[in-house]
Amino acid sequence: MQPRKSARSNKGQHSQWSLQDVLRQEQDDDVNSEPRRKKSKVESDSDDVYDDAGEVANASSENDDDDDDDNNNDKNEEDGEVRCTPCGANKDNYDEETDEGGTMIECDKCHTWQHAKCMGYRNERSIPKKYMCNLCQESKSETKKKPEKEQTTPGYSFTLRDKTRISVAKAFFGVFHKNIPPASLPDGIDAVMMATKWAQELEAEVFKVFPSKDKHYTDKSRGLMVLIKKENVMRRISTGELSFYDLVNSSPEEIDEDLKVYAEKVRQESIRRSVLTVDEGSQRIRRTHKGEEIVEDANRQSEEADVNVVPRNIDHRRIKEDSPPREIITNSESQTYYHNEEDDDDDEQAEADGEESNKDDVNEDSSDSDDDELDMILKDKKDENKEEVEVRQQPAKPAPVPAKKPSFEKESAEVWKGEIVFPDFASFSAVAELKSCTNYVEPSDSQTARNFSRFIKVGKELLSRKKHEVEGRLDKNRADDYLNKVVSSRDFYLIEIKPTANHPDYDKLYGYLLDREKVGVLSGKPSFAKDSYLITLEKSRPLPPYLSTLKGFEQSTGLFALYVVRKGYVPAAPSILKNRSSYNVPAPIPPTNSNHHSKPMLPQPPAMAAKPKTPLLDSILSTLGGAQANPVPKPQPIPQQNHQFQQPHFQHQPSGAYNRVPSLPGKPNLPSKPTFGSNASNAPNYNKQHQTSDLNLSGDQMRYLQELVKNNPQQARHEPQALVGMAANSGASFGGSGLPAGDDDDEFPTYN
């Protein structure tokens, strides 16, 4: 009976296991068959090699007795010396049986043995086919580096490695070799050696300035090659007057005097070509890069225009056909001569001056439209025309009159008078003068005078109060750091504070801030000023950095107000209605001889001061009301319901009619102010049908109209209706009474 056999013959075995065993065996055979001079020391613990049967085999190839070549290799390997420098093993202390270093490998060059682990190889597969020990590798690297360091060129040698630097140095060498004066060569040194030395030194200086070797490096090298070719530059280099450092870091004009003279000639020629020239035909020619352009002569235009003007004040009886040519005289006797520069009409003269001032100020700041600056411009125009040039008759071609230089007057630098107070410490009267500011220019003509006037206006706005207090103190170093940071983004105004007399409190405050290194904080700065400080300056000490940028300032000892102002601030132009504060000045005067009424009266606004009406006021009231001015209306009792007033329309009324004054936009029409004690006999008689339409004018409205007429007499005399538009446009300035703003409709709020 045969033993039972399982249907699964490969039960418990992997189907591919035998194939993997074969592949592993072939790989091991290939590894063992590689010709390698290696010495494997087998240790029973760590370096055992197992064969396919699982038995331990010695790495010294004792099982390969049949191979004669392997025996010969083992014999040669035993002959090499052991020299493992990392662990210190050598032929004296090395014992193959007790060595724990593991596998040893032989150097293919010196045939010495080292531990594979000491040489950095973790296993046998990482060992290269051609192995060299650490000592042999160092000697090999040194021999390879030596030829790379030196790059010889016939005639001279350089130790540079970069191709760009070598090419630049060679170019310098060529220029030096050709241009070195033989007399400047020292004994024992020829031109080749000197040129080589100079070329290397010059290239090194260029490389220090431009280490990136970019376009600037090459451009600078080319420029230096042109310079060192010049005889005077080469002479200065050979004598030691010009060093290579100065040669690289100086401009060509500073090195070569001839080039400096040539550059100056080029600049002068450029300036000459840019200036307008006048040819013989009185044509102005502008020379530009596009060529010559003929510009129409403005003087010729003005002369032709003067010829065509028909004079209105010429005495035609003096003109004769055979009259002599005109002669230029000074206007001192007759007023019948033709006025060539001014017209006798005041209105036309003012209009012409206004047009000229507008043309002059097209490119100026908006502040040039201020009244004071306009007065200065008009004053300059009048100063130019003080000596009037007149002609007896009008020739065919008038002769040109030489123009006078415009004159100007420097405005006073004083911007303030008042009192400086340090609470509970010091108080003194002082004046303030503008010393300097950002973009400050000392007045030298009409333009700079206008700018100076603008600076003075800003200074007056900064110190607008009569009394300024020192609100606080700040450490000077901290303030200096802050001011140094904002000096480029803000405008600075430096104003000197001087006492009106020898005041001890001034010296007391100055000594306190100076000794303790403090900065005072001034009160009352306007909205356009960010900071206001009271600082101390001493002539013997250097200026702070933020003040060194201010021009026109000579350092002195004393107290100074420093304002940090918004960049480019320009003072606003004044309104056509000046002195607005005067509308609030009149104080109420209690009425006298009041009439007693049984009914309660309306609450009245403050009474107007007794002030006689002027004819101008009567004129405008007549225009506004449509009739003659009415005396102050009679008192009215309180009605049962709230009064609502309708805004009247402007229209012509028949003589004797008296209409209510139209209310201004944005202001209510208040009930009329009662006046007590007025005699009925003194009041004019009116028709009964017009008694109900008395003038309704409050005290504030009356004061406003009086100031309006006072400040604008021309409009009140000739165009009273224009004052209504002025009052409408400046409704915010209506007396400052704090009344509620009216609606845009015809109905106004009820006065309770």
UniProtKB/Swiss-Prot annotation:
Which gene does this sequence derive from? BYE1
Name of the featured protein: Transcription factor BYE1
SMART domains annotated for this entry?
A: PHD, TFS2M
- Location in or out of the cell: Nucleus
Quote the function comment for this protein: Negative regulator of transcription elongation.
> SUPFAM superfamilies given for it?
Elongation factor TFIIS domain 2, FYVE/PHD zinc finger
Disulfide bond sites: none
TFIIS central domain: which residues?
A: 160-283
